[in-house]
């Protein structure tokens, strides 16, 4: 009621101050969900490292050369689909050798199975009072192998792979 009163009086500063206390402790607006780690397992120094962002196509690109092979990662996020896609390519067939893992700065568990990583957890605070999440990372590859261990997917001899990352939370 006090926030509404402040808004009707056009006292936006007071309304903003009051809304900070609505949900209580550990209910920050934005908390980190997960971190996708892609660790290149190839030999050699990185050269021609480049990052680009195209606002027109909503595409972020990272590229580098290592031992004469050009590697590229293209990142695309779709808000309607609640999905992030990352395409890994190389200028030489079967040149992608990397480890992909998930971690988070908030309480979580990670499980690897087949070509998929699943991370579950909850926002800071007591689990029974916090927002819970489940995110799935799935990889589609053309060739090579993907081997899961406890919490990592190992890609070996892959020419191209697309990583799909989706998320769902208990937030209403």
Question: What are the functions of these language-model segments?
Answer:
Residues 1-172:
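Aromatic-residue-lined binding/catalytic grooves and analogous aromatic/hydrophobic interfacial grooves
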């Amino acid at each position: 009621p006090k926030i509404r009163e402040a808004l009707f009086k056009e006292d936006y500063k007071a309304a903003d101050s009051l809304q900070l206390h609505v949900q209580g402790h550990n209910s920050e607006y934005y908390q980190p969900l997960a971190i996708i780690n892609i660790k290149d397992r190839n030999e050699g120094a990185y050269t021609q490292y480049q990052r680009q962002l195209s606002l027109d196509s909503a595409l972020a690109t990272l590229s580098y050369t290592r031992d004469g092979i050009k590697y590229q990662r293209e990142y695309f996020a779709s808000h309607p689909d609640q999905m992030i896609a990352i395409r890994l390519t190389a200028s030489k067939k079967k040149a992608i050798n990397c480890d992909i893992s998930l971690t988070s700065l908030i309480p979580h568990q990670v499980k690897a199975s087949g070509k998929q990583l699943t991370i579950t957890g909850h926002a800071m605070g007591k689990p029974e009072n916090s927002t819970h999440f489940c995110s799935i990372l799935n990889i589609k590859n053309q060739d090579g192998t993907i081997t899961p261990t406890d919490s990592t997917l190992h890609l070996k001899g892959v020419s191209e792979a697309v990583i799909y990352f989706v998320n769902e939370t208990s937030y209403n």
